[in-house]
Amino acid sequence: MVAILTPIYEAEFLGFSYGFRPGRSQHDALDALGYGIKGRYIWWILDADIRSFFDTISHSWLIRFVEHRIGDTRIVRLIQKWLKAGVLEEGQRLDTLEGTPQGAVISPLLANIYLHYVYDLWVHAWRKQRATGDLVVVRYADDTIVGFQHRSDAVSFLSDLKERLARFSLTLHPEKTRLLEFGRFAARRRAKRGEGKPETFDFPGFTHICGTKRNGQGFQVRRKTQRKRRMAKLTAVAKELRSRRHQTIHEQGQWLGAVLKGYYAYFAVPTNIGSLRAMRHHIKVRWRMALQRRSQRQRMGWRRMEGLADRYLPQPSILHPWPEQRFLVKHSR
């Protein structure tokens, strides 16, 4: 079913939608955002969080959206059947009029269809009809960032967005949705008002920070690993090390090396080298603690531990280009 529907909707989905689409990744979304903030007049960021999106998708609206594009009633009935299968709550299957089936392969596509009609097309029209300055938007699944040149546009957009979502059984999370000053002049303007450093925002997996280039000249969006993501990975590593306590040092080292390589593959972006080095250090510390708990007779001194780290834990290096470089290559005309 996904193989049938995907080509149909790929021809319909808009360019600023990146989540769960073939040939598009989280880094493509990050590149588009970085390029938009640096290359356009963007002084304000709306970090919009839809409350419990996957659990509150209206089945009736979703079916209407599918019927708008799909004329085959057999496909529509099959989707209705999946939706009526219900969701799991504390081990019990409940019939519901909202939400997408948990774990179903088709769920991400259905979510994209829903947001295409509820959000994407509306944002596209709003930008053309209402925006008085530059506006950039990037959406990855239900995580969306909108950048504005004018604060008045941002305030109007947020008010209109709340009304728009309410029509389709969706709401913004009041505590997680934020409008913040950002961009190349944010630090200077806040300093004049006697305020602190510009606020930061997260998208997806990275904290975005107003910064400068290494030579101190010129604005640069700096990205570092989101603290929540880093701590979750370290917690998972510590837990897995306990289950691997009977493995040899060589086996543990090979596994930890693979973990770090996978971590670097996503997070090794420009401006994030410090966070990567810290991650390697914290994994080394947790490995040492695990080895010491395993062998009470022989202490694992730092000199020996450094030798093991040099052998098994790869040093970080930047693997991804600057966002504007990769974005321009992929979207060159």
Each predicted region: which residue ranges?
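Non-catalytic terminal/accessory segments
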Residues: V2-R333
